[in-house]
Amino acid sequence: MLREFREQRIKEIEQLKRKNINPYPNRFDKTHTSEMIKKEFEGLNPGEVKDDVFVSTAGRIMSLRKHGKSAFFHIKDFYGRIQAYIRKDVVGEEAYEFFKEHIAIGDIVGVKGNVFKSKTGEITILIKEIKLLNKPLRPMPEKWHGIKDKEVLYRQRYVDMIANDDTLNRFKVRFEVIKLIRDFLNSKGFIEVETPILEYVTGGASARPFVTHLNVFDIEMYMRIATELYLKRFIVGGFEKVYELGKNFRNEGLSYKHHPEFTSIEIYQAYADYEDMMNLTEELFVYIVEKLFGTTKIKYQNVELDFSRPWRRIKMRDFIKEHLGVDILEDSMGRMMDVLEEHGVEVEIRDKGHMIEKLWDLVEDKVVQPTFLLEHPVEISPLAKKHREDPRVTERFELIIYGREMANAFSELNDPVDQYERFLKQVELREAGDEEAQMMDRDFVRALEYGMPPTGGLGIGIDRLVMLLTNSATIRDVIAFPLVRLKSFEEEELDIEGGSQE
């Protein structure tokens, strides 16, 4: 069906060209968006025509009803949909015959005319001129119908956005969230900076990196897993408030909340600590939620989340002890192992830090409302400053919402000797087979030796945040072009064929 449709369209385009009609013109003078037209003319009475105002807009035809000498159709642009009405006695016989013969659902057109409100109260353009701007070679996809594999819509997101307004709107929200974050931080004096994506030594998180080869130097390099260590170098160099919003890469699995290529923001402030970062996190999240929804309460997966300040604070030690009966600071590794085995959890590397993380994984989903999880043990926090009152734990928090980590923050470790020793422990873990343990970064230690002021740092996962704000169940729904298993072009054509209409 797709092949026949495409061949027919190619013939039609050749026919248009023979008539000296360009099916792909270079530009169109669009003076109004659909949203502008609706707002400007919402005060019209049903049946009233605004004869003294001429509008020009363009978009894709999403529906079309032809009635002999007239037709109604809806045009979709980035801002919404607007109804258009074409009549033979208004545009003339030649233009109307062209419309009847060559304009179809899916075509991109430009229209010019006056605006009126229909008898049913819908703002409508009375067309005086219409111009074909693009004649697609493929039929319009129906909304999900017949598509056997949802991954088709991930592979061909442009099809998803054409067919489903919800998808387009979801990405509008995503990029509005990113804008709001930048606006908020810029207003507070933070400076957006850039750090390398290709690194000689990668660090700043516990993750397996992507490895590549730099031909010009004939050396192995890594794609960054986090921006932390270079952003701290900015603080050493004299910057006091910095952030970077961009892509990180971790060569790990896919899940509803994990994606190997993901977007995050990291924020660093000199002369601040993790308490300051908690306040900043609350303020930022409330700012975003109120800007988008006009309230601090939203629904996610049928659960009401309340972002009103202040948020709950819990200590990792206390929460695990309450729910599992094990003390992660006092109990032996054997006791922790027993509890994990009771819950059917396998521990590949029998290290205290790994066991603590596995224990937390068992109880994380019990935290639903915005909550700060505090005071992670030193073993799982190699870049965080030790707590000023208990050196067994760190001045660190994670923001947990709906059982998911949304943010991670520290009072940043700025003691170069302590940092070097913690790197050594990470190296020992790597040598024992832990591919996610951090590498030794001697240049970063050298930077700390020049002196870094007390600093608070914060990292936020943009994709997970957008999941919450768009009520999306999986991370791939909020990444425009996510990773999917490869299929041949021919296999993809078969998958999409059932979801097309002529």
From Swiss-Prot:
Please report the organism this UniProt entry assigns to the protein.
Thermosipho melanesiensis (strain DSM 12029 / CIP 104789 / BI429)
- Its gene is lysS
Q: Does the keyword Cell membrane apply?
A: no
What Enzyme Commission number(s) does the record list for this chain?
6.1.1.6
Q: Which cofactor does it need?
A: Mg(2+)
GO biological process terms on file: lysyl-tRNA aminoacylation
Q: Which NCBIfam families match?
A: lysS_bact, PRK00484.1
Query: Which named protein is this?
Result: Lysine--tRNA ligase
According to its record, what are the GO cellular component terms?
cytosol
Subunit structure of this chain's protein: Homodimer.
Q: Is Magnesium one of the keywords?
A: yes
One of its Pfam families is tRNA-synt_2
UniProt subcellular location: Cytoplasm
Q: Specify the domain of life of the species encoding this protein.
A: Bacteria
What's the record's note on cofactor binding?
Binds 3 Mg(2+) ions per subunit.
Tell me its family.
Belongs to the class-II aminoacyl-tRNA synthetase family.
Binding residues for Mg(2+) 2: E405
